[in-house]
Design a protein with these regions (language model features):
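Short beta-strand/loop segment that forms part of the nucleotide-sugar
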Residues: 52-61
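Short phosphate-binding loop-to-helix
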Residues: 67-97, 150-153
Length: 205
């Protein structure tokens, strides 16, 4: 068994108008931010329950009451998303797994990676991106220049791992649209995200 990895979560402070803008409409910016906060809280709770060497929140904005104990908080660097992801890995001195705040359905089982016989983990997303990237020997150069937020992002990032021993994680759906939100909530009905979505949907009727 390899050393426990650092678990990285890259996220934005859930402020109205700054997060989940593709949920508006049908949701207001305030409701979209509430859903983002619930998704982030679920994600951080899962990371907190997953064995790890360190747990690091790479944050744009300020931490709030949604942050559980046990996390280091570092600020995101300026630049494009590829640069910010690369910089997140630069905080690690050993194996690391990075995820975002858009997959509240993640579980400790999904995040419990072991690099004993592989060099990388890759978690593809339904929209063509990726929800997880793990590196046994973090190299920021593997991310720099990858076009982000396009249908090709995942394929380009996966190709960057050529020559490494890669394990693919299950394909997950990011929460980008209201349709995504419904499907994701259905896969994790007991979470904060599903509860908040049900509350907001009922309140809007």
């Amino acid at each position: 068994m390899s050393p426990l990895p650092t678990l990285l979560v890259i996220a934005k402070e859930p402020r109205p108008g700054r997060v989940k803008t593709r949920l508006t409409p049908p949701f207001t910016p305030q409701k979209a931010a509430a859903l983002a906060e619930a998704a982030l809280a679920d994600t951080l709770d899962t990371v907190a329950r997953t064995p790890a060497h360190r747990r690091v929140l790479v944050l744009e904005g300020e931490p709030g009451p949604w942050l559980p104990p046990g996390f280091e908080v570092v600020r995101q660097c300026p630049g494009g998303l590829d640069e910010r992801l690369a910089a997140a890995f630069a905080h690690c001195d050993g194996p690391a797994l990075l995820i975002g705040m858009d997959t509240p359905q993640v579980t400790p089982e999904l995040l419990g990676v072991d690099f004993a016989d592989c060099d990388a983990y890759f978690g593809p997303a339904e929209d063509g991106g990726f929800w997880a990237l793990g590196l046994a020997d973090p190299d920021p150069a593997l991310l720099l220049g990858v076009p982000m937020s396009t249908p090709r992002t995942g394929a380009v990032q996966r190709a960057r791992l050529a020559g490494l021993r890669v394990r693919d994680l299950p394909r997950l759906r990011d929460v980008d649209t209201a349709y995504d939100a419904e499907l994701v909530a259905g896969t994790a009905p007991g979470g904060r995200f599903a509860t908040e979505l049900a509350r907001l949907t009922e309140a809007g009727r």
